[in-house]
């Protein structure tokens, strides 16, 4: 009798839809109008479908073979054979998933090995893994700061930092992007608070600007504050040895806590981490809600990430190559007359300012065989629409030149250059 019941349920698993209530209708109308407004303003985002591995040359679901210039795959490790093999091997030895949070039964030897490798890479005392850097930032501030404390944040910090700060009870202050005068004024005004934490991206993701960490550290020391750096767009390739923005400025030992991601240069999978002072990491293990209430990272991803750090420890070849590729792309685009955000980072924003123009430009580039995306409000401020190109160590010079030639053709057609 039980068996028959199960069979009937399986055969009739599609439940009838509930009748739409008046409240449901009103909500649907409101949401539909909001979506219509987004479309009319040229701000509607669509998702193109890729049917190959992430790489510099990919195929979309409509069969197009295109060059990819918009991935965070800075070191070209997303489809690296060694990284893939490490993930496959871990499937056999450690399984697919852990079905648990860390403090119950979700910690394997692989997780501890990866945390140790990250600590070694950054020269820090301890590391804690998260399912994403968004979660790492979401679980940091409310854990280590209270009502007696102050957090001072750069205005261009990533959304995850902004949301993480909103969750904490500390006094919140904000300074204009890399404005050291404003930062110092906030430090002066907040003297007497129990703890002052300066929070900044190491690299600001929409512009490719690198934070002035040497100047920030000087102020931090002068006013006895702490410093947190989200180095998601720097880990693995910024600095002489790829240790990030703090290494670039020679202040690695002065950063109290870093957050970063495994989902960009470090293989492009998923996962994030916080690394820094031992006491901070220990408290996060006890009280950080995204850590305590989220499943641990799956073993194949962890093993692949360990392999990434092994690859990075061998040489700086990939770091040097992405730097050279970015320099070549910037030089050719500038020579062609495009308006670029200045810098040396492989994030190279091509400024178009108008959202509809950015979308049309990206669409015409796709017809040329170059995959990029237009960025516009609310991802960037109103009137600051752009195409954010991202250069990889895996790009060949021929691929870069082909992309630039396509930019030039489209730019001339649309009157941009």
Predicted regions and their residues:
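PLP-dependent enzyme catalytic core of the Aspartate aminotransferase-like
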Residues: 1, 15-20, 25, 81, ...
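N-terminal "arm"/small-domain region of PLP-dependent enzymes with the aminotransferase-like
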Residues: 28-96, 225
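Active-site phosphate-binding strand-loop segment of PLP-dependent enzymes
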Residues: 73, 173, 177-229
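Conserved N-terminal alpha-helix of the aminotransferase class I/II PLP-enzyme fold
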Residues: 85-133
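Conserved PLP-anchoring active-site segment centered on the Schiff-base-forming lysine
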Residues: 140-159
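Pyridoxal 5′-phosphate
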Residues: 176, 180, 199-202, 237-242, ...
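Active-site C-terminal subdomain of aminotransferase-like
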Residues: 223-226, 233, 238-344, 357
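Conserved PLP-binding catalytic core of the aspartate aminotransferase-like
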Residues: 320-329, 334-369, 379, 383-384, ...
